[in-house]
Regions:
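The feature marks proteins involved in alpha-glucan
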Residues: 1, 24-108, 113, 138-219, ...
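Predominantly extracellular/luminal cell-surface or secreted proteins
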Residues: 19-21, 122-124, 162
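Catalytic domains of carbohydrate-active enzymes, especially glycoside hydrolases
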Residues: 237-251
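Ordered, small/hydrophobic-rich secondary-structure cores
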Residues: 1-12, 17, 32
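Short beta-strand and strand-turn-strand segments in soluble, beta-rich domains
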Residues: 127-130
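Short beta-strand elements bearing conserved aromatic residues within extracellular beta-rich modules
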Residues: 16-18, 119-121, 157
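Short proline/glycine-enriched turn/loop motifs at strand-loop junctions of beta-rich domains
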Residues: 9-15, 112-119
């Protein structure tokens, strides 16, 4: 008989149900907090996991019913070393998906950890416990990925990486758009709202040969260039200084 098997981990639950638009199906406890439910049909339906703890029901969306947010072209270009828009594939991105059970919002996470045995994402959205948010490996690319329903912009997060010696280590996101102020080290989910207004400059650049033009790079450290300034204050002073000195680029 055609059916769909759903497995989920709810270690302390007294009972677990899988809820679809058609109703609830009770799951069977297999072992070690792993529960299994069998749904009729061949297509994976929109569903949620209902975990019962005493008199309390906890309703949540399953991260693993969503397709990977990193596509085949991303992994191919990344493996070739030719991916030129990595900030769109890796890091943390707020997303919303339609569903028969209602619109689902959350955050997709992706990180490159080619030598990891396993990777989990931890943060404010899961009590810093990655048990239910172990990330999926994207084949030989070394990329790990997961979509976490219910995660919100502004929440802190880190990646928890298992080394070959089986030890776990917490790491900040190298592709994060925002981070905590030191000495705290967590990354922060942040949506990009910047509107570029450099069409004229981009059009002018398109007509030039970058290999034939001059280049003079001004290398600087933001924190020590002129201490006490914000990013915007630095920008106001830096551009005029660089132009006056005759540099063409800033690092």
């Amino acid at each position: 008989e055609d059916c769909v098997t759903v497995r989920t981990i709810r270690r302390l639950a007294d009972s677990v149900f899988i809820e679809t638009a058609e109703g609830r199906t009770e799951a069977v406890h297999e072992w070690g907090g792993v529960w299994r439910a069998v749904l009729p049909g061949t297509d994976i339906p929109d569903y949620r996991v209902v975990a019962v703890y005493g008199d309390v029901e906890n309703l949540s969306d399953d991260p693993y019913r969503f397709l990977p947010t990193v596509g085949d072209m991303d992994t191919y270009l990344f493996s070739e070393g030719r991916h030129e828009r990595l900030w769109e594939a890796l890091g943390a991105h707020v997303r919303t998906y339609p569903s028969e059970l209602g619109e689902i919002s959350g955050v997709s996470f992706a990180v490159w950890a080619p030598n990891a045995k396993a990777v989990r994402v931890i943060g404010d959205f899961n009590g810093w416990d990655g048990t239910l948010t172990a990330m999926r490996t994207m084949g030989s690319s070394g990329i790990w990925e997961i979509f976490v329903p219910g995660a919100l912009e502004g929440q802190r997060y880190k990646f928890e990486i298992q080394y070959p010696d089986l030890s776990w280590h917490q790491k900040a996101d190298p592709m994060a758009r925002r981070a905590e102020v030191p000495p705290s080290t967590a990354s922060i989910v942040t949506r990009s709202r910047f509107t570029w207004e450099d069409e004229e400059w981009m059009d002018e650049r398109a007509g030039k040969d970058p290999h034939a033009g001059p280049i003079s790079v001004y290398e600087m450290h933001l924190g020590s260039w002129r201490p006490g300034l914000s990013y915007r204050e630095i920008a106001e002073q830096l551009i005029g200084h660089v132009q006056y000195c005759g540099f063409t680029h800033v690092e």
